[in-house]
């Protein structure tokens, strides 16, 4: 939010990192804050500051394959294919270093970044194109060199990468070798037993690759919470606890290791994944792993195995920590009425579950005071709304938390390290009559878990293929029509599917976008070249409602007593008259 110039390369952060998108919306207002300072206005006088600035904003350059929700605040938008986005980034890096480009858009972007005191470069992996990430790093390198050369400036450039999943960076740091699924499949005959740890490979491998894996003779053990297509072919499936029922450590995109704890006790006979792995090790005769009894021991072992993970032991206190001799309650004082929840079944309060792995208790008993910030289960204070009570846990209003920072940085910002070359040659060659597929992420739908809940899946909508107005006119299709996509790749079976059409106002030339992560688009590969044609047999979808009370009608009818009052009967007549016409909200 402190940046005064932003360059976004190939990332639609509204859908891949919504919190970053909110921060960027705040960042473009820094120009208004600067004008307010010159005029003697306090920043908190929001109406006056907005009136002074009008439409003046800090520069934000968005270079993407398709339109984004941040286009309305961008000073410049450029629509390019993924390989051209990488070229654009490298050209900006050279322009910052003093080699102007023939492309005026490149020079404008470079000038905006050079004139900034706190420039920010944002990129990510959503396009699945490593050259885009490299180009963002090259721009950051060029900005660092520029700022260091000017000794009068005490400013720094910033670089932010958006990651696909919550622990993508942590898993990358754990991997000593750059092992890939393709390399794994190439040597399945060398693997006696394959353990799949909470990873739905049916979303990451094609059906042919799944068949190759399951028919290789390798024994497959899966630790999984949710059912998927691969589990039926596994030799052993162990039911793992969900993230809300187990403990662990995540590494954020900032490079900060943060501990998470169970929200509620694990149900049924499931165990946390680390406990299943420990039991498997004991069954296979691995005595060293079998002796691990607590998660803290695993954390300590990780810290001892690698210098990079040494801070893990200090991320959070161990399970023996007590606040003034007591565990820290997960529940607020408002949970005092919990005994009445099941009073219709039994007036006896059930015995609360114990938690031997954390300093927290599954109850409201304990002391929520003076503990480290990483062990604060909730923010609540008498007389304050929950979000406003945060100040009670800070050393000062809008200041740091009183219990110290949450987590430990494994990766610290540095001005030195490996550098990225500003040279890049694209390998993609376009064929006449074909369009390049680029993934288009949705905040609801692209994530694996977002469609597991019916209400969220309804927000996700159906899978789609997005095209520009000119291509839509050429193919004679409109929003909601069907479009056939045919992809032929060397050495692989051809892929043919039909998707609903979505027309975008801004899309890179020779590109079509598809909704990434949807079950019907998993077979499509980013960068593949596709043939497009209208699907005349496509059934158009019915108009979608924002909300409907149809379900509430059904629930109310099912729960109604058998003897209706006169008012109920009159209401039933009204509903019979309006049957099938849900009310819009």
Regions found by a protein language model. Give the residues of each.
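Long, well-ordered, tryptophan-enriched scaffold segments
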Residues: 5, 14-124, 128-129
